[in-house]
Structure formats: structure tokens, C-alpha cells
């Protein structure tokens, strides 16, 4: 499998970061296709619906969930007046569905994390297309020799 790991700090509080990353009102801002329903996460887009297991949900600490056959997590920790966010995706090499393969999926999460950082720093969300190009190119080079 592949492991995509991204670590960054934001000037937002732990509570603000958690609210954005792990609540329905937060998802509405950066990933409106997601909703928490009981102990599952529901992804709905253009007639497609997938119910994914919520694997961990520790308030202000960690959210982890199945993402198709991958596992995605956000872990939060306090750093003085900042919050450290660690994103991880463990993704099988044969990951794939009608929308994405492993590379496209990782590109999407790299873009999402840039957007999350901007939201938490009170900035306008970036235009996604140039970010997709940047990260797609980066991953092509990274995965080339594997």
C-alpha cells in the first residue's frame, strides 16, 4: 500500500480545527459531499452514495474513517498558540472505483489539505484547478520509480 502523510500547523485553535475537520458544519465548508450519520460517514455526489465506517472519533484529537478501501485520518495536537494537523491516508496500490485511482485520490487529498489550511487561517479557499495540476505532477514524479 501507499502511505500519504502530511503534517502542517495552523494558527487556529484545536476546537476550531476539530469543528472544520470532524463536524457536519465543518464538512459543509470544505467537503460538502460528506456527512456524519451515527458511526458512519456518508459520501453523496451526483447520484452516487457510499457509507463508510467511522473508525475513530476522539473529540479535538483524531478522526479516522474508511475511504473506499483506504483509511483516512486527521490527528490534532496543540502547539502553543497553534494546532498541528497530521493527515494520513493508507491506500492500497490497487485502489480504484469509477471516480479515481490511487494517484487521483492522493492528489485530491493533497488539494483538500491546502484548502483546509487556508480555511483555518481565515483566508479565501484557493482555486482548485492549479493545485490539482501541481499535485498531480508531483505524484507522477514520486510514484514513477515504484
Specify the residue positions occupied by each region the protein language model found.
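Hydrophobic/aromatic beta-strand elements that line small-molecule binding cavities or substrate pockets
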Residues: 8, 52-56, 71-78
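Short, hydrophobic/aromatic-rich segments at coil-to-beta transitions
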Residues: 36-42, 56-64
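Intrinsic-disorder/low-complexity, polar/charged segments enriched in Ser/Thr/Lys/Arg/Asp/Glu/Gln
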Residues: 3-7, 40, 49, 62, ...
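A short gly/proline-enriched turn/hairpin at secondary-structure junctions
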Residues: 28-34, 40-45
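Hydrophobic ligand-binding cavity/cleft-lining segments
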Residues: 1-33
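Short, highly charged C-terminal tails/helix-capping segments
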Residues: 118-146
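Short, intrinsically disordered, mixed-charge
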Residues: 19-26, 59, 111-118
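Beta-strand/loop substructures that line and gate deep hydrophobic ligand-binding cavities in soluble
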Residues: 66-118
Amino acid at each position: 500500500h501507499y502511505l500519504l502523510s502530511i503534517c502542517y500547523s495552523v494558527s487556529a485553535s484545536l476546537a476550531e480545527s476539530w469543528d472544520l475537520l470532524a463536524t457536519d458544519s465543518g464538512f459543509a465548508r470544505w467537503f460538502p459531499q460528506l456527512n456524519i450519520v451515527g458511526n458512519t460517514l456518508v459520501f453523496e455526489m451526483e447520484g452516487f452514495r457510499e457509507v463508510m465506517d467511522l473508525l475513530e472519533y476522539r473529540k479535538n484529537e483524531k478522526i479516522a474513517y474508511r475511504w473506499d478501501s483506504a483509511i483516512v485520518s486527521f490527528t490534532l495536537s496543540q502547539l502553543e498558540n497553534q494546532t498541528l494537523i497530521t493527515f494520513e491516508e493508507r491506500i492500497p496500490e490497487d485502489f480504484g472505483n469509477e471516480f479515481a485511482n490511487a494517484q487521483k485520490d492522493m492528489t485530491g487529498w493533497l488539494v483538500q489539505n491546502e484548502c483546509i489550511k487556508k480555511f483555518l487561517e481565515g483566508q479565501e479557499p484557493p482555486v482548485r484547478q492549479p493545485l490539482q495540476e501541481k499535485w498531480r505532477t508531483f505524484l507522477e514524479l514520486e510514484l514513477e520509480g515504484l
